[in-house]
């Protein structure tokens, strides 16, 4: 399944920058960054359960927020890209 994960972490307080880095790393471990606080993540249900628990354990819900957009099985037809940073097909062939 394809999930778009977005986050907003308050960095003005002590520990905020560290939480921001940890949230970004958790997302990077499962997907690709498409904007500063936006990741495209293609996971199976077990991986999603693990990532979601990890993310929600990292944030302070009174200051930070996470948003999940479930794009479904036909996500490639629903996503359009214009401009720099072309999309990477994580399921496609890898040429080394």
Question: PLM features: residue spans?
Answer:
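Basic nucleic-acid-binding interfaces
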Residues: 3-4, 10-96
């Amino acid at each position: 399944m394809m999930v778009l994960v977005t986050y907003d972490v308050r960095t003005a307080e002590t520990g905020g920058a560290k939480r921001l880095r940890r949230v970004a790393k958790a997302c990077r471990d499962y997907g690709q960054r498409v904007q500063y606080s936006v990741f495209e993540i293609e996971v199976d249900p077990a991986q999603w359960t693990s990532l979601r628990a990890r993310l929600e354990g990292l944030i302070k819900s009174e200051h930070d927020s996470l948003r999940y957009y479930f794009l479904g099985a036909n996500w490639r037809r629903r996503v359009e890209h214009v401009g720099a940073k072309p999309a990477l097909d994580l399921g496609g062939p890898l040429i080394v």
